[in-house]
Amino acid sequence: MDPKLEQRARELRALLQKASIAYYVHDAPILEDSVYDRLYRELQELERAYPELITPDSPTQRVGEKPAEQFPTVSHRIPLYSLENAFNLEELKEWQERLWRVLGRTPEEGELEYVCELKIDGAALALTYVDGLLQRGATRGDGQSGEDITPNIRAIPSIPLRLATAAPPPVLEVRGEAYLPIAEFERINRERCSAGDPPFANPRNCAAGTLRQLDSRVVAARKLSFFAYALHWPEGWPSGDPPQTQWECLQRLKDLGLPVNPLSQVCRGLEEVVQFYERWRQAQLPYACDGVVVKLNSLRLQEEAGFTQKFPRWAIALKYPAQEVPTRIRAIVASVGRTGAVTPVAELEPVLLAGTTVSRASLHNADRLEELDVHIGDTAIVRKAGEIIPEVVGILKELRPPDAVPYRLPSHCPECGTLLVRPAGEAITRCPNPACPAKIRGQLQHWASRDAMDIEGLGEKRVAQLVEKLGVRTVADLYRLTPEHLESLEGMGSRSSQKLVQAIQRSRQQPWERVLYGLGIPHVGVVTAQILAQHFPAPELLAQARAEDIAQIYGIGAEIAEAVVAWFADPAHQKLLQELRELGIPALPRQAAPAVSQVLAGKKFVITGTLPTLSRQQAKAWIESRGGKVTASVSRQTDYVVVGSDPGSKLKQAQALGIPLLSEAELLALDPK
């Protein structure tokens, strides 16, 4: 190989990477488009003639020629949490008050410093760089795991294949948002309409769908963009001091060649946060934006504030006001859910709302019906609750037609005819019949859902057939179905029947936490199921637990604990669990024991400062796995305060109350094993 050719290839790669960073990160192009294209073609021709010159970070290697067959599921080394939402300034103030309490601070100690970032309406991504090279890109998924879509990530031109540094961290985890510029979204929809295809509903849906394309050439053609907003260095920072604030993180991301939204700003106190929010609320931006993300600037205070089951306590999304539209109520139906809750649902004249077509909206309950005085034929004001679920929020009574009909919930279940009940103190009307077909359908659909047993092909229509035609009554019945049973159903042939039975049988291997979530215990969501499964690694152990023991687990509480105990005490549920265990579900030994001793059972800990070797989350997990509970604030009920370097005001509070202090080493010594 001619050394001059190798040198030229290196020069071209370096120049093209520098030009990309100047264009996408600094918005300051250093090359005309025609010059960039000429240099790109020169590198392409060199690599075509001498394939040994091709490197993984070459700009010519962004788009592969061969479509992927599927996207494997991968675990996130660092979870991607959701954000708590605030829909008005009062909720924002309440969040800050909670933050003050968690940090053990008062307003008199000075305003907190925040970083405000525009909340781009796109798809969250997790990027992993190893020794400076892009190794993996994945979707957010459920926050714990997502799909490995690396070929598609490489096709997004603003995401660098190599970090712009000679001394990268050994591993760098980057979080950001892939989005579709509005102009590009409109271009794609024009082309789809011209081709006779239905247009995409909104840029977010288009971006998410594009990222899951099996052919990365489609991704490249749609010209997605990307903004990075977080970074983590799990194996250390290479040289100098690591970032100490969120603002420094954004600057480091930019220095590494990753695009960062230039409209972010440091704000001192909520007054400046509100000014930032108002400044951009009505702005015409080149991308969809649905609010402002407010984050504590100090990384040390972020770590001290910690996380709830779902959200970081140190960040919140201040959402823009929800879009509201009027439309006519054509009918109202009573919908029965898997718990027996009866919800009035308005069937509407279809209307476009927040980028999607809405034809049904919730009326919540009987109290809401009475409060709104809803009539069939009314013109209703509809909005999306939390930007997700359409709901009726008002009635334009001045537009009520003479033939409008008042609506009241039925006295008997529309599915099974059982007299409905409304427990004292509850707003929800319920069907008490455990054999109600609607409840059975809901339970089966929940069991088969993606976050539970993830049974592909077992959707709403198929579940209805199983209940109506084959007499399926419990989730255990699913595992007794054969292809011959299914072939009797409309639309099911030999091949599709075998495929569904295989999907059902595969789900036997799902872990205990998914089974637990799939059981549909009240108040037990995905995260709660994971926590319970960690502490009680078999159904028998959880079934034997007392409510007070369950309530001691960090992140659970009395209401969830009582619901769990009540569920396991029901004879019908005990029978179902026995049937599942006989079927080998969940797939674990019949006798399981806790992995570690419970030497810290009943003890309450508070952590303050930075520990020498353990992160705050690692220390919390260590304590909880041994039966202890980690709380956010110091009180007289606190047993120990674990103190690291640079502690906060919690140290003074502990000293004032005479609470024992522990170093990290003293903490670990509490369990000699």
Swiss-Prot record:
Catalyses which reaction(s): NAD(+) + (deoxyribonucleotide)n-3'-hydroxyl + 5'-phospho-(deoxyribonucleotide)m = (deoxyribonucleotide)n+m + AMP + beta-nicotinamide D-nucleotide
GO-annotated biological processes: DNA repair; DNA replication
Residue sites binding NAD(+) per the record: 33-37, 82-83, 117, 140, 177, 295, 319
Listed SMART domains: BRCT (SM00292), HhH1 (SM00278), LIGANc (SM00532)
Signal sequence segment: none
Gene3D superfamilies: 5' to 3' exonuclease, C-terminal subdomain, 6.20.10.30, BRCT domain, DNA ligase/mRNA capping enzyme, Helix hairpin bin, Nucleic acid-binding proteins
Xref: CDD domains: BRCT_DNA_ligase_like (cd17748), LIGANc (cd00114)
Active site, UniProt feature: 119
Known EC number: 6.5.1.2
GO cellular component terms attached to this protein's record: cytosol
Cross-referenced InterPro entries: BRCT_dom, BRCT_dom_sf, DisA/LigA_HHH, DNA_ligase, DNA_ligase_AS, DNA_ligase_CS, DNAligase_adenylation, DNAligase_N
Keywords assigned by UniProt, alphabetized: DNA damage, DNA repair, DNA replication, Ligase, Magnesium, Manganese, Metal-binding, NAD, Zinc
Binding site for Zn(2+): 413, 416, 431, 436
One Pfam family from the record: DNA_ligase_OB
Needed co-factor(s): Mg(2+); Mn(2+)
BRCT domain ranges (all copies): 595-673
Function text: DNA ligase that catalyzes the formation of phosphodiester linkages between 5'-phosphoryl and 3'-hydroxyl groups in double-stranded DNA using NAD as a coenzyme and as the energy source for the reaction. It is essential for DNA replication and repair of damaged DNA.
Entry's family note: Belongs to the NAD-dependent DNA ligase family. LigA subfamily.
HAMAP family xrefs: DNA_ligase_A
Name by which UniProt lists this protein: DNA ligase
Organism field: Synechococcus sp. (strain JA-3-3Ab) (Cyanobacteria bacterium Yellowstone A-Prime)
